[in-house]
Structure formats: C-alpha cells, structure tokens
C-alpha cells in the first residue's frame, strides 16, 4: 500500500491506536524482514544467506545479483527498479538457496535461474513460476524415494 515500506509515523500511529509503548511497535517493525522502514525499489529481492542456503550456494546467487544490478546489500538501483537485501532464514531451508522476490519465494536457485529472473524483471515480465526452479514438488527429496514404494530416480 505504501510501495513496500512505512514511515516511523505509521509505527507511532499503530502504537498509539493500540495504546502500547511506541518502542514495542518499533521492535516488531524492525524484527521482521517483511517490514521496510525506508523506501525500496520496485523489485525487492531478499536473499537468505544463513547456513542451509549458504551450504547450497546462496553466495553464487548473491554474486549474480550484485554483478547484474551493480548494487550491494541494502542498496537500491539509481532507476529505483531494484533493492537487494540480505535476510535471515526464510523458512524454506529444504529448497535452498531461496530468494524472496516481491510476494513470492523462488527456491532451488542456481546462478542461471537467478540470472534469468533478473533478466525478466528488467523487462517487466517475470514468467518464471515461484517455488522450486528445478521442478521439485514441495520439499520432496531430489532423486530419492518419495514414498515407501517409490524406487527413486
């Protein structure tokens, strides 16, 4: 409703409305990564870099974003099209590495899939479906049994 961010005045308003100390509302607003306290770009890319994602290659995903967008974490492109943020666990560890773009999770990312996502976002036409980028259904194991009777791949 406010281009993915809200000002301190909004936090104060909510705290006053709920008759709670303003610091309590501020604590909530600064704890969760879905709340931004400063303007962000049209395309907000948040990349998880905690241990499971790091072990599965999130550094490569970060490198692609930084190189393609020519920005670092916490920065917005000069045309205000992209903001890149580093975030803590997004809760999709089994499908790591994960990026949260807009309102969707993109999972099982590779350098190539992230590069394609950025290309599509730059054109304003994101065609890739959210979720696993390698065709996994939910969090099923890769190449292993999916049930007791399954032979695996």
Report the location of each language-model feature.
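Signature of N-terminal electron-transfer/Fe-S-associated modules in redox systems
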Residues: 1-153
């Amino acid at each position: 409703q406010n281009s993915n961010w809200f000002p301190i005045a909004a936090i104060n308003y909510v705290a006053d409305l709920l008759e709670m100390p303003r610091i309590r509302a501020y604590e909530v607003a600064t704890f969760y990564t879905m709340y931004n306290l400063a303007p962000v770009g049209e395309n907000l890319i948040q990349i998880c870099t905690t241990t499971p994602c790091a072990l599965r290659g999130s550094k490569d995903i970060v490198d692609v974003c930084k190189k393609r967008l020519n920005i670092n974490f916490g920065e917005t492109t000069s045309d205000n099209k992209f903001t890149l943020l580093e975030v803590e666990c997004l809760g999709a560890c089994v499908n790591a590495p994960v990026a949260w773009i807009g309102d969707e999770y993109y999972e099982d990312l590779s350098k190539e899939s992230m590069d394609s996502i950025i290309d599509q976002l730059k054109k304003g036409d994101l065609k890739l479906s959210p979720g696993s980028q390698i065709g996994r259904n939910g969090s099923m194991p890769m190449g292993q049994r999916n049930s007791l009777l399954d032979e695996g791949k």
